[in-house]
């Protein structure tokens, strides 16, 4: 049995899609009857852990360092040569059309995973007309797939509004052994030359417009001392201010987990996430979360943090201040418990394989070693 993922959103620099695919690769590697290949423009062919295949592509402005194929034909030929039994497309560009073309020729199922809220992202940048165009495009594309998965109920609802009524809720998961409160080290404040009483906030991810980091920086500056913001990642240039510390992206997940666990509160100001994996990673490390909405709101509730109005500096600042007047230890323990009970990869991956199993048919059931689906749609 050969499963192939193709996406322009897989890269060594990490991100939610990369974490998902790397975890899938490790999971499938323990099942000797299964082969798994990741095809992406952002890798070199030849790696075997995971197995990677390069898709010829060029840098594309506005997609933050990722590369995009110039045609559908070349990636479709590469997919056909891999002879998969199932293809999953992790973006809505040429890779998705290539997956459809190869799947039709091979007479195999094609799955789409909706990792990026394209209409809303384009609306933020180009307005309502671009949003309508993206919505029409996605509807035309995704109706041709045998299955469409979305990581949050909000995204399932949005796809239904586009006319894709059969989309299924398939959340992502967390490595609870890597992301855990035990990663905390008490010397982080001293290492950053901060006072012991500093209230340490953290954001990790790409520095892009849709993450709304300017909003977060303004809120932290409005709060003043003793608040300090740790920004982990890279991308667009952001202001250098005394209350902000920048740390480059951490490819090593254990290093990222140590940083997360050593802070007080995760703050996520963006409202365009389809899931919010970094928020879940922080929760697994025992951090309460202040968030603004979108799919992240499905992870955060009154027992694990606070939700504030999106696009409001005042609301974000008030929420950050308010959470420090609550029991942070209790909120963090609740956050960890929620991650354990609902989002362990050991629960999520069998659910995903059950989705695949339904497409492949009972004759190949033994090949997938699928478990029951426990996620309610």
PLM regions with names:
Residues 237-254:
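Nucleotide-activated donor-binding/catalytic signature segment of Leloir-type glycosyltransferases, i.e.
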Residues 1-54, 221, 374-377:
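N-terminal subdomain of nucleotide-sugar transferases
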Residues 136-185:
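Donor nucleotide-sugar binding/catalytic pocket of nucleotide-sugar-dependent glycosyltransferases
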Residues 4, 195-211, 217-220:
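Conserved donor-binding/catalytic core segment of Leloir-type glycosyltransferases
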Residues 79, 142, 258-263:
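Short alpha-helical donor nucleotide-sugar binding micro-motif in glycosyltransferases
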């Amino acid at each position: 049995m050969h499963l192939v993922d193709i996406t322009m959103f897989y890269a060594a620099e990490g991100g939610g899609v990369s974490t998902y695919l790397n975890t899938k690769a490790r999971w499938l590697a323990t099942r000797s009857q299964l082969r798994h290949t990741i095809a992406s423009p952002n890798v070199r062919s030849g790696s075997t852990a995971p197995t990677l295949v390069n898709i010829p592509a060029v840098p594309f402005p506005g997609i933050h360092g990722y590369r995009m194929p110039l045609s559908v034909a070349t990636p479709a030929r590469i997919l056909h040569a891999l002879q998969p039994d199932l293809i999953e497309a992790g973006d809505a560009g040429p890779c998705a059309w290539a997956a459809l073309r190869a799947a039709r020729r091979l007479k195999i199922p094609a799955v789409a995973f909706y990792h990026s809220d394209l209409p809303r992202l384009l609306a933020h940048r180009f307005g309502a007309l671009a949003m309508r165009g993206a919505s029409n495009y996605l509807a035309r594309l995704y109706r041709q797939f045998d299955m469409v998965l979305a990581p949050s109920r909000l995204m399932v609802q949005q796809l239904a509004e586009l006319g894709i009524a059969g989309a299924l809720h398939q959340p992502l998961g967390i490595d609870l052994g890597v992301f855990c409160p035990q990663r905390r080290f008490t010397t982080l404040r001293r290492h950053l030359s901060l006072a012991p009483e500093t209230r340490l906030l953290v954001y990790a991810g790409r520095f892009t417009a849709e993450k709304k980091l300017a909003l977060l920086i303004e809120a932290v500056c409005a709060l003043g001392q003793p608040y300090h913001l740790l920004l982990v990642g890279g991308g667009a240039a952001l202001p250098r201010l005394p209350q902000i510390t920048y740390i480059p992206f951490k490819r090593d997940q254990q290093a990222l987990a140590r940083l997360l666990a050593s802070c007080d509160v995760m703050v996520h100001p963006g409202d365009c996430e389809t899931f919010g994996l970094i928020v879940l990673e922080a929760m697994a490390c025992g951090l309460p979360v202040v968030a603004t909405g979108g799919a992240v709101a499905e992870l955060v509730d009154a027992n694990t943090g606070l939700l504030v109005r999106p696009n409001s500096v005042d609301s974000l600042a008030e929420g950050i201040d308010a959470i420090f007047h609550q029991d942070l230890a209790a909120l963090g323990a609740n956050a960890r418990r929620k991650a354990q009970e609902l989002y362990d990869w050991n629960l999520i991956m069998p659910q995903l394989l059950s989705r695949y199993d339904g497409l492949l048919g009972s004759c190949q059931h033994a090949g997938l070693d699928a478990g029951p689906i426990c996620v309610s749609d």
